[in-house]
């Protein structure tokens, strides 16, 4: 099975910067987030999309619930959202704060989802 290209591999830096500019212009209260499955992940299903526009008032626990629902995970299935491939942030942190401190130079906030088996490893996005 060929490995899936990441969002950064599919879009040039210039395209991503323009994407963010248009998103922020059209949706000033939304945070542009890219969520991809950790490349070595075996337990979690693949998300049906990678680009999310998250309302800026949402906290991390709400985002986790949304992604769990999209993945159709059971309550007992382990699931972690890692910011920039390595940071776990408090579930009470508003996404707007995470965005300001962790956004990429292209303007997107990158996250990877992983099951417990990858917890604690440095992940590359």
UniProtKB/Swiss-Prot annotation:
Bilayer topology annotation: Lipid-anchor
GO cellular component: autophagosome membrane; cytoplasmic vesicle; endomembrane system; microtubule
Domain of life assignment: Eukaryota
Covalent lipidation (Phosphatidylethanolamine amidated glycine), chain numbering: 120
Positions of the propeptide removed during maturation: 121-125
Keywords associated with the record: Autophagy, Cytoplasm, Cytoplasmic vesicle, Cytoskeleton, Lipoprotein, Membrane, Microtubule, Ubl conjugation pathway
Transmembrane segments: none
Main location: membrane
Task of the protein: Ubiquitin-like modifier involved in formation of autophagosomal vacuoles (autophagosomes). Plays a role in mitophagy which contributes to regulate mitochondrial quantity and quality by eliminating the mitochondria to a basal level to fulfill cellular energy requirements and preventing excess ROS production.
Subunit and partners: 3 different light chains, LC1 (a cleavage product of MAP1B), LC2 (a cleavage product of MAP1A) and LC3 (produced by one of the MAP1LC3 genes), can associate with the MAP1A or MAP1B heavy chains.
Protein name as it appears in the record: Microtubule-associated protein 1 light chain 3 beta 2
Native species: Homo sapiens
Gene label: MAP1LC3B2
């Amino acid at each position: 099975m060929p490995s899936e290209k990441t969002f950064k591999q599919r879009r040039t830096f210039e395209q991503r910067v323009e994407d963010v500019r248009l998103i922020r212009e059209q949706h000033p209260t939304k945070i542009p987030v890219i969520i991809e499955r950790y490349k070595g992940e075996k337990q979690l299903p693949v998300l049906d999309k990678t680009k999310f526009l998250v309302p800026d008032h949402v906290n991390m626990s709400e985002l986790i619930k949304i992604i769990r629902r999209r993945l159709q995970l059971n309550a007992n299935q382990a699931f972690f959202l890692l910011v920039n491939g390595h940071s776990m942030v408090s579930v009470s942190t508003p996404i707007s704060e995470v965005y300001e401190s962790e956004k990429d130079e292209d303007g997107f906030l990158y996250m990877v989802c992983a099951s417990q088996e990858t917890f604690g490893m440095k992940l590359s996005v």
